[in-house]
Amino acid sequence: MNSRERILGRVRRALVDVPRDDPSYEQAVSRDYACEHGDRSVEQTVELLAENLADYRAIVHRTDAEGLAGLIAGLLEKRGSASVLVPSGLDEGWLSQTGVTRVTDRAESTPHELDRVDSVVTACSVAIAETGTIVLDGSPDQGRRRITLVPDHHVCVVRVPEQVVSSVPQGLERLDPARPLTWISGPSATSDIELDRVEGVHGPRTLEVILVGDA
């Protein structure tokens, strides 16, 4: 008997007294909770996202599609970045105005190699206003999870308003639970028992979010 068979055997034994006609999990759990708190316009929802991102100490920028490449170039220059990690499906135009060395995301890249990269630029899957959360799902323009956890500086682009939702339930409706989801609420931060905050222990110390709207 292998490990898989042992685990499944324990599950079967635990369920032996459950009636066959017992309702499924989806039916048994009530999901009539509110999908969002309050009634906001699209503009107010975007503003709430910006406020909560800033409250988590993320740095928020706003631009339109035409100004995006210039803004990213300026952020990398201000940061002093000599290299930037690039997901395979990132829009090439986003980095068209910077001469920073581009490092391609490779499966064989080691944590030490990723740690030597100064910045990473990604898109996102959805942004949640009520919690100030950015969610990545590992799509080609976002890359694998570790490329946004190892470099110290993360620039994340959010298209507004189409990628912005009010609440977590609304965000979950857009996400595939089978994808490798990374939920980001501000730069990495942790506190010890005395509430001394330390940033950068579990991810980037600096998170810059660019809200890209219509011109």
Regions found by a protein language model. Name each.
Residues 1-215:
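The feature marks the mature, well-folded catalytic cores of soluble enzymes
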